[in-house]
């Protein structure tokens, strides 16, 4: 299977005007099976990726599990590349991810990764961002993506 943008479903989300879906067309893969519904939009020069936490995303303390926050961050790197960058997110890979947890995520509120591209070269995308819930910060991060061209069938 060629990894092209066609593996994503990113059309308008009728339940959230101004937002687009960010889902893999195969719901049995990680994004859909673990993260659930994801929506995204451009906000000026930034990208916002939103998830809707469920009980399965909580840890024993009743807050959003750190692994879920990390997964949202990783997915947001590729959303950023697609929404405000120039690369094909499908065949790309995460090279580096640095995260600082700042606070616990409330599972009753949407969780957003807000990102910006610091630099984009022919092969790399440097992204930084924050995970937020309204005015509350959950994490800060930076990451590097390695772009690859789509594989031929």
Regions found by a protein language model. Give the residues of each.
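Terminal targeting signals and extreme-terminal segments of soluble enzymes
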Residues: 1-153
């Amino acid at each position: 299977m060629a990894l092209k943008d066609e593996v994503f479903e990113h059309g308008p989300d009728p339940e959230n005007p101004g937002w687009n879906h960010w889902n893999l067309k195969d719901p049995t893969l990680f994004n859909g099976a673990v993260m659930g519904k994801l929506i995204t939009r451009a906000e000026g020069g930034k990208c916002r990726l939103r998830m809707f936490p469920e009980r399965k995303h909580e840890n024993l303390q009743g807050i959003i599990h750190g692994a879920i926050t990390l997964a949202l961050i990783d997915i947001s790197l590729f959303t950023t590349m697609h929404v405000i960058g120039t690369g094909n997110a499908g065949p790309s890979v995460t090279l580096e991810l640095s995260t600082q947890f700042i606070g616990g995520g409330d599972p009753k509120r949407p969780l957003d990764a807000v990102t910006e591209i610091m630099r984009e070269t022919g092969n790399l995308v440097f992204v930084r961002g924050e995970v937020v819930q309204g005015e509350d910060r959950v994490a800060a991060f930076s990451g590097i993506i390695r772009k690859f061209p789509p594989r031929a069938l």
